[in-house]
Amino acid sequence: MHSTEVQAKPLFSWKALGWALLYFWFFSTLLQAIIYISGYSGTNGIRDSLLFSSLWLIPVFLFPKRIKIIAAVIGVVLWAASLAALCYYVIYGQEFSQSVLFVMFETNTNEASEYLSQYFSLKIVLIALAYTAVAVLLWTRLRPVYIPKPWRYVVSFALLYGLILHPIAMNTFIKNKPFEKTLDNLASRMEPAAPWQFLTGYYQYRQQLNSLTKLLNENNALPPLANFKDESGNEPRTLVLVIGESTQRGRMSLYGYPRETTPELDALHKTDPNLTVFNNVVTSRPYTIEILQQALTFANEKNPDLYLTQPSLMNMMKQAGYKTFWITNQQTMTARNTMLTVFSRQTDKQYYMNQQRTQSAREYDTNVLKPFQEVLNDPAPKKLIIVHLLGTHIKYKYRYPENQGKFDGNTDHVPPGLNAEELESYNDYDNANLYNDHVVASLIKDFKAANPNGFLVYFSDHGEEVYDTPPHKTQGRNEDNPTRHMYTIPFLLWTSEKWQATHPRDFSQDVDRKYSLAELIHTWSDLAGLSYDGYDPTRSVVNPQFKETTRWIGNPYKKNALIDYDTLPYGDQVGNQ
């Protein structure tokens, strides 16, 4: 008599799938959850970490009996990458990004040693031990996830197609985007998930570095300005240029806004005769890169490409013998910000204070105050210091500490018809302006305390529409649908007593002149006492020969897209000259 045993087919288990998901999600989503709960960023990081961590289920589905081995091998890689990212966040309060790689590769050996030594603090060791213990515990709970054939292949392909192949096919073949741009977009989505933050970060870093190197080489090949003269003498001096972000003057009490959003600058304006407030300066482009390609060079709306063929303001100051510094709280190395990094690398020394993965992450401009003080103490006889702020960049609530929301819930002086979400944004923007006021005033005060021979100029790169213009439904910036608030900017000049003594000038008759930020390099040259072939005193807002011209706005690369700023409606609103 023969007995036969029929081996039962293993069954699919939701519990086993749940543990597998939890295991792979743990390595990426924990950090993203901490970032979100801390209020430093939104939910996109959590979403993308959950989605792209799920790719590791594919080998688990295909080879269920080997789940422990597969999970261990993959887990070691995920553990190392995610632990490094977690420790970086604990130490620096920032998410790992390609900007971090840029700064790391630009760092000298001593600085790198200081950086690495921080990882071996007791706090980091305890975090690493706890993190490892949880990872091992989750690994011990793993069980095979059996999906019957051929469904395991279908499910695995569906995961791969939905997360990788479909976005590539849609963007490349349907939307006709360049394949390189498609990969960049996919890499950005994958970045929150371990170990992709390192792989995509390095890929993006290399892409931007190649572009950066090319632009810098082209800039270095430019001939110097001809017939160059510095008429300011040989005395030691320090000149400061502070670049703000997304700050429109119509929301500053300094310019008549009824809410007290700039109390420190208001006080300085009342007590310090050397602070001049210009009332009628507008930007030409409502986007950071595009306007700085004009404001920091000889380019303008009619000649937008001159930034490629003529020296920049930074080149000019180095030609005049200045040691140049760039302190920035903007992102360092991204596809969008490559030109900013090019400008910064045209200076002698850079301080990159913001390594966040996204611009819409919580970061405060007080970051710049310490390096600013350090540079003020630099012994160089002639110094140019450029400080680039995040200002009031969206998301506005991430530009100031959570406990400093002075205008939260305030309905005074609010446009009619705003819903709760719009009111929150409106008040957040005023809170951001209040914090920006503190930073800008602190820079002026710190500069003044150094007893310098020089001057400081502050302007915002562009404005921001935050439900200001009727019918009060627009927020942000749109060059194709412009409002005055997108272009109206603060423009301040502070001169030291020493500078005023040797360069006596009265700017009181200049403050209401109509001026475009695109012509800044001529005003800066005038203030600094520089002349050369191409300098035009009629384009300097502080020169007696100044001539008002049409203030063009719009995209100069589009046919018939330029319009006269002064033809825009609602010029009677506060700050809308």
UniProtKB/Swiss-Prot annotation:
GO cellular component: plasma membrane
Molecular function GO terms recorded: phosphotransferase activity, phosphate group as acceptor
SUPFAM superfamilies the record matches: Alkaline phosphatase-like (SSF53649)
Compartment annotation: Cell inner membrane
Keywords: Cell inner membrane, Cell membrane, Lipid biosynthesis, Lipid metabolism, Lipopolysaccharide biosynthesis, Membrane, Transferase, Transmembrane, Transmembrane helix
Keyword hit for Cell membrane: yes
Chief location bin: membrane
Example of a GO biological process term: lipopolysaccharide core region biosynthetic process
Enzyme class: transferase
Transmembrane segments: 17-37, 44-64, 69-89, 119-139, 154-174
EC number: 2.7.-.-
NCBIfam families: CptA, PRK10649.1
Similarity remark: Belongs to the phosphoethanolamine transferase family. EptC/CptA subfamily.
Subunit note: Forms a complex with an unidentified protein of approximately 36 kDa.
Its job: Catalyzes the addition of a phosphoethanolamine moiety to the outer membrane lipopolysaccharide core.
Protein name: Phosphoethanolamine transferase EptC
Name of the coding gene: eptC
